[in-house]
């Protein structure tokens, strides 16, 4: 149900080189429970090619006897109009238990027809962002990427207006190097001049442990997933 708010405060200031934001809210106490307190601070420093930032949150949940503080430092570096590198370092502290994570991404668009990107993600088994954020799972290391080629220079006699060729991959383990299912796929998207589209996709998944379904339940912490492959054909009119 809903809870009354004792107070809420928001402050935002944006300048040419620095952005500052603060949010605070406190829930009212009820007859049989105490309200939660939420606080968030965002700082971002901008320059010509580099942006660096900080995000901090703190949540006090007295009913659960739980205090959660999260610190995140992030950056985005653009040496030119074609290349972008970004990343973040994260730390959560839940009742004095620390968790850590990081992500790094790279994107290169040398021309209008080609793009290539990669990402590296690491989250240990203690990091927890759930009090004032979201993390789909922890305890994993993943390398993921996409390479895409777009062809729009088709003959005038062609029935197609453009074609996209895409390679996707994701390699995963947990933080103890137990292999999790990894995936590879190739996709062809063909756009016709009558604005219908045809999509052809083939994919392959390796075998490995899956602990997302079980949520690491003590009696059955993971499922052994078999390898698999498949095809997909989709036509959109």
Spell out what each predicted region is.
Residues 16-19, 50, 83, 110, ...:
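Secondary-structure transition into beta-strands, especially the periplasmic turns and strand N-termini
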Residues 20, 38-93, 153-166, 232-237:
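Surface-exposed extracellular loop regions of Gram-negative outer-membrane beta-barrel proteins
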Residues 13-15, 22-26, 56, 89, ...:
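Glycine-rich, histidine-containing beta strand-loop boundary motifs that form or position
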């Amino acid at each position: 149900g809903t809870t009354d708010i004792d107070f809420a405060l928001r402050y935002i200031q944006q300048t040419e080189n620095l952005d500052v934001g603060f949010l605070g809210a406190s829930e009212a106490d009820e007859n049989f429970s105490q309200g939660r307190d939420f606080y968030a601070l965002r700082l971002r420093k901008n320059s010509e090619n580099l942006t660096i930032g900080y995000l901090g949150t703190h949540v006090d949940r007295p009913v659960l006897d739980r205090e959660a503080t999260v610190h995140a430092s992030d950056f985005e570096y653009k040496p030119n109009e074609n290349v972008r590198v970004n990343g973040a370092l994260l730390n959560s502290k839940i009742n004095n238990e620390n968790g850590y994570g990081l992500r790094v991404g790279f994107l290169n668009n040398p021309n209008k027809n080609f793009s290539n990107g990669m990402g590296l993600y690491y989250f240990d088994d203690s990091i927890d962002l759930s009090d004032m954020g979201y993390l789909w799972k922890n305890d994993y290391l993943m390398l993921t990427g996409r390479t895409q080629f777009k062809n729009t220079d088709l003959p005038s006699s062609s029935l197609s207006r453009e074609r996209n060729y895409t390679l996707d991959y994701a390699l995963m383990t947990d933080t103890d190097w137990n292999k999790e299912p990894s995936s590879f796929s190739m996709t062809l998207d063909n756009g016709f001049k009558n604005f219908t589209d045809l999509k052809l996709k083939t994919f392959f998944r390796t075998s490995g442990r899956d602990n997302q379904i079980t949520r690491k339940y003590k009696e059955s912490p993971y499922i052994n997933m078999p390898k698999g492959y498949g095809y997909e054909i989709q036509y959109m009119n």
